[in-house]
Amino acid sequence: MRSRKSLPPLPPEQACLPWHPPGLVAGVDEAGRGPLAGPVVAAAVILDDLNPIEGLNDSKKLTAARREALYDEIRAKALCCSIAEASVEEIDRLNILQATLLAMRRAVLGLRLKPVLVLVDGNQLPVLDVQAEAIVKGDSLVQAISAASILAKVTRDRWCERLHEQYPEYGFDGHKGYGTAAHLAALRLHGACEEHRRTFAPVAHVVSIARMAEPLAAARVAAAAQGAQALLLSA
């Protein structure tokens, strides 16, 4: 009797997932959990099996130019897609995890077609009224999640480039809001802008120092005014 050889495992990238029920499947991912500034952005994508997109992968593994090209192709070829965000105010009020899940929920609710299954990158699920499953490293394993990661990343990067025009002193077009040495140095020099997340430790530290310095600065201004008045009276 011939022995049966075991089949080789599927490659780790873009594996076919056999548990999908029949119907539309949406992939969901986010961008912007780690940065010190700006919203967290989420995207939901339902791909068209009859209109495949070559080169989908985790957005972090792609160059900026490749992400931009795929962004346009995804928007053109997907059955539907939706992009949503949670604001800086919501991040500071809810915390970054809950704000991320809120953005994901908004993205799914924004789809014009309702999926029967939602596949979410990571190990946490937003509150949804459809079946959902969290997949660790899903942005490398599931094409729809890869597509969502690209839409979310490009959308947030474009937001950072617009923010740079408003606040060029922080260099948002380069670090995209992440806590690089250059960004932290700009924070210390210029303080926090309106788009910085006050509950994130580096920003909270800068804000607290600024608040402690306010009474001292006010006292110096008052003393200078009193000195000027005294000089006028003595003249």
Curated annotation (Swiss-Prot):
GO terms for cellular component: cytoplasm; ribonuclease H2 complex. Residues 23-212 form the RNase H type-2 domain. Keywords: Cytoplasm, Endonuclease, Hydrolase, Manganese, Metal-binding, Nuclease. It holds the Pfam family RNase_HII. Its cofactor is Mn(2+); Mg(2+). SUPFAM superfamilies: Ribonuclease H-like. Its EC number is 3.1.26.4. One of its GO terms (molecular function) is manganese ion binding. It is found in: Cytoplasm. Coiled coil: none annotated. It is an enzyme of class 3 (hydrolase). One of its GO terms (biological process) is mismatch repair. Manganese or magnesium. Binds 1 divalent metal ion per monomer in the absence of substrate. May bind a second metal ion after substrate binding. PROSITE patterns: RNASE_H_2. Its main location: cytoplasm. It catalyses: Endonucleolytic cleavage to 5'-phosphomonoester. HAMAP family: RNase_HII_B (MF_00052_B). Belongs to the RNase HII family. NCBIfam families: PRK00015.1-1, PRK00015.1-3, PRK00015.1-4. Endonuclease that specifically degrades the RNA of RNA-DNA hybrids. This is Ribonuclease HII. The lineage of its organism: Bacteria, Pseudomonadati, Pseudomonadota, Betaproteobacteria, Burkholderiales.
